[in-house]
Amino acid sequence: MILLRHGQSEFNLLFTETRKDPGIADPVLTPLGHRQAEAAAEALARRDIRRILVSPYRRAIQTALPVARRLGLGLTVTPLVRERYAFSCDIGSPRSELALAFPEVDFAHLEEVWWPPAEEPAAQVEGRAALFRAEMAALDDWAHTLVVSHWGFIMALTGRSVANGESLEMDPTAPAPAAISWRHP
C-alpha cells in the first residue's frame, strides 16, 4: 500500500513561516502544493494502483485528483484517514460544499459534518489508524491501494513523519509501530 501526504496547503505555508495557527479552515493547496500533486501523479503513474482512498479534506482531494485522472480511477472518500484534529486547518468542509467544489467525486456516503467537534487525543487517532490497518490487512489487494492522507494519520499508522507531497510504502500486515512520537518537524 502506498501512503501519500497531501501537497503543501495554505495552512502549511503560513504555519511553517510563523509557527502560529493562521486560522484557515480546510485550506486548499498552494501553487507548490499543486506542483507536488502533479509530481506525485507522474511518479505513481507507473505503479499498479487499482484503488485510491482519500481523506475528505480539500487539500487531500486536490492532491489525489491528478493521480486519479492519470490512472483513470475514481476516488473513495473516507474520513477514517482524515487528519488528527488539532488546528484550524482540521475543521473540514461540509459534504454539500465538497460536492459543489468537486463534482467528479462521490460524497453521497459522507456525513454532512464528518470531522470531530474538538481536538482529537493521540490515542483516538492511533485507534483510527489501528482500525484502518486491520481493514486493509483483511483485503487481498491492499498492495494496489493508494491512500492520500495527512501528517498525523500517517504518523499514527507508520510512526514516520512525511513531508508534503511525500509518499511511502506500508504493509498493513506488518506490526504497528511500538510507539508514536507526535513531534512535528
For the regions a protein language model found, what residue spans apply to each?
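Short active-site segment of divalent metal-dependent hydrolases/proteases
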Residues: S9, F153-I154
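Beta-strand elements within well-structured catalytic alpha/beta cores of enzymes
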Residues: M1-L4, L53, A143-F153
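Acidic, low-complexity terminal tails and accessory targeting/binding regions
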Residues: M1, R84-E104, D140-D141, M155-P185
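Glycine-rich phosphate-binding loop signature in dinucleotide/nucleotide-binding domains
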Residues: A45-D48, M136-A143
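Phosphate-handling substructures
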Residues: L13-L14, T18, G23-V28, R70-L131, ...
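Active-site-proximal alpha-helix that buttresses catalytic centers in soluble enzyme cores
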Residues: L4-V77, A101, A122-A123, G165
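Short amphipathic alpha-helical/adjacent loop interface patches that line ligand
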Residues: A37, A41, A129, R133, ...
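Short, well-ordered beta-to-alpha junction loops that form the rim of enzyme active sites
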Residues: V54-R58, L80-V81, L110, V148-G152
